[in-house]
Curated annotation (Swiss-Prot):
GO biological process: meiosis I; proteasome-mediated ubiquitin-dependent protein catabolic process; ubiquitin-dependent protein catabolic process
Keyword Hydrolase: no
Gene assigned in the entry: PSMD13
Any one GO cellular component localisation term in the record: membrane
Annotated source species: Homo sapiens (Human)
Record's protein name: 26S proteasome non-ATPase regulatory subunit 13
Chain positions found as N6-acetyllysine: K298
Amino acid sequence: MKDVPGFLQQSQNSGPGQPAVWHRLEELYTKKLWHQLTLQVLDFVQDPCFAQGDGLIKLYENFISEFEHRVNPLSLVEIILHVVRQMTDPNVALTFLEKTREKVKSSDEAVILCKTAIGALKLNIGDLQVTKETIEDVEEMLNNLPGVTSVHSRFYDLSSKYYQTIGNHASYYKDALRFLGCVDIKDLPVSEQQERAFTLGLAGLLGEGVFNFGELLMHPVLESLRNTDRQWLIDTLYAFNSGNVERFQTLKTAWGQQPDLAANEAQLLRKIQLLCLMEMTFTRPANHRQLTFEEIAKSAKITVNEVELLVMKALSVGLVKGSIDEVDKRVHMTWVQPRVLDLQQIKGMKDRLEFWCTDVKSMEMLVEHQAHDILT
């Protein structure tokens, strides 16, 4: 049995932080007000006084461990995560987290958070195989939780960092966006916002099968790059989203300086040409989606002979549905893959809806005026 009162008294006199906080901890512990004590400890472990040294490890060993069985499992793991950061040996930290996982197995959320922390440590020491297995295991558990919880953001942070490490741009793009969807952007430092926006933008451009940029373009994190030396990335993303090949080529002086983009220029050109075809289909009225080879060639900046191959590629990856008339050199589109729209695209859709409403109104007036002739 540890001497908890003695530890708390000593800490009031010479421990880190304010003596009043230590006194409050002693008071709540003595009165056995476990919920209030948990909240106080959760707040205290984030105090800057613990930024250096092993104060949190001592706090756990001499105090928290004595009543941890009375603490809400998820709150206990939240506290433990701060303690673990002071452990310099990752193997010691992993063993500690494994023991904690056993203690909180009554709560799925607590187990998920614990496993996520284990995965993060494994990623830091370069054990990619175990990290991958942990992500797969935790993802299955997350799918069984109702709605979005406080543990989702930590999981998506881990999974996106793993995919970034192994160079899987498409999966990184997906999970990094999910992470941003689970947090308040104001809680992230501007420097982190800028770094996340930049890596997300690059991943979107380079990611195989990523044709949806609307969600990123509408997210406030991208604004952190505006009016900086990385503004060109925003412009490039907008060019891709609208399938503007000419604009993309104009911006080459900027994006061409980025090594990854420069090395994948041919792949980027193919992607924006596919997006160009999607945008041409989307902006046409549903009853007028006949595209000539010449129109496609002009917009996509390719020769007429290359059009059929471009359309076949778009059809094969499911971006559009339709048929090719080789004789008349036309393409008839019947469907285009849904995407998150930017404001300009939404305005275009609004204009087309208003045009359709006007058409319907005109037809209504025509029928009204000629009703007598029609009925007789």
